[in-house]
Design a protein with these regions (language model features):
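Conserved donor-nucleotide/metal-binding helix-loop-beta segment in metal-dependent transferases, i.e.
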Residues: 105-131
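Short beta-strand-to-loop acidic/aromatic patch adjacent to the donor-nucleotide binding site
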Residues: 86, 91-101
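A conserved acidic beta->alpha catalytic loop
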Residues: 51-56
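N-terminal nucleotide-binding beta1-loop-alpha1 segment
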Residues: 1-16
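Glycine-rich, basic loop-to-helix element that forms the pyrophosphate-binding segment
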Residues: 77-84
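Active-site oxyanion/phosphate-handling segment shared across diverse enzymes
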Residues: 141-226
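A short, N-terminal amphipathic alpha-helix
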Residues: 29-46, 59-61, 65-66
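Acidic metal-phosphate-binding loop of nucleotide-sugar-dependent transferases
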Residues: 75-76, 101-103
């Protein structure tokens, strides 16, 4: 069974243009995301789904430099872009990760992926309801459900946000990976604003290098320590 991690990426963020190519600890944000995705247990391939326009050529080039496969598709119809990438890859299971989450955790993602690839759910995530820091969000689904959504979803919001059709469908067997409890959802580890960028730059200056820096517990320890400095 081919399990593909597909990362959506583009330059045209309305709140922070070009964020995926911004430097973070001597590499781009996108490079961090793709490296982490390549370490997800059970993943066979990592693909970056990039809009098919000239402005996003640098994003595609950076993804290729990082060793990811690149699929080009519609900028606005993100669902169609994902479905096209999954078909192109011959994927049976698809994991969705966004490119503004440079602290995405491979182990958490692997646990979500296993809920579909091994346990038989049609769709799985770790935010139904939210219980992890914002920035560790991931989703996995059977490619057949992704293809069905691409064919049947009609609302603009369903095309833009990829999975609402699947998440809301009564026939879809869903599973959720619950967080460790406490006040985890109050932590924000994603990149949408200049303030987020400043925070993440400080986080990466303090995180240990290499695989030890990937675990969400390491990021949490750094954030808690920073708050008490």
């Amino acid at each position: 069974m081919t399990a593909a991690v597909i990362v959506q990426a583009r330059l045209g963020s309305s709140r922070l243009f070009g964020k995926v190519l911004m430097p973070l600890d001597e590499r781009t944000v996108l490079a961090h995301v793709l490296e982490r995705c390549a370490a997800i247990p059970g993943a066979d391939v990592v693909c970056c789904a990039v809009p098919d326009n000239e402005m996003d050529n640098p994003v595609a080039a950076e993804a290729e430099r990082c060793g990811a496969k690149v699929f080009r598709g519609s900028e606005q119809d993100v669902l169609g872009r994902y479905a096209g990438a999954a078909k192109w890859l011959g994927a049976e299971t698809v994991m969705r990760v966004t490119s503004d989450c440079p602290l995405i955790d491979p182990v958490v993602c692997g646990d979500v992926l296993a809920l579909v690839a091994q346990d038989g759910a049609d769709y799985a995530c770790n935010n139904l309801p939210p219980s992890w820091p914002h920035g560790l969000d991931c989703e996995a689904m059977k490619a057949t459900w992704l293809a069905r959504a691409a064919t049947e979803a009609a609302r603009p919001s369903e095309r833009e946000h990829v999975t609402p059709f699947i998440r809301n469908h009564p026939d879809c067997a869903k599973a959720n990976l619950a967080g460790p409890g406490g006040r985890m959802i109050e932590h924000r580890w994603t990149l949408d604003t200049p303030a987020d960028y400043d925070f993440l730059c400080e986080m990466f200056r303090r995180l240990p290098r290499g695989a030890r820096g990937w675990a969400w517990r390491a990021a949490l320890a750094v954030e808690i320590g920073r708050a008490h400095v």
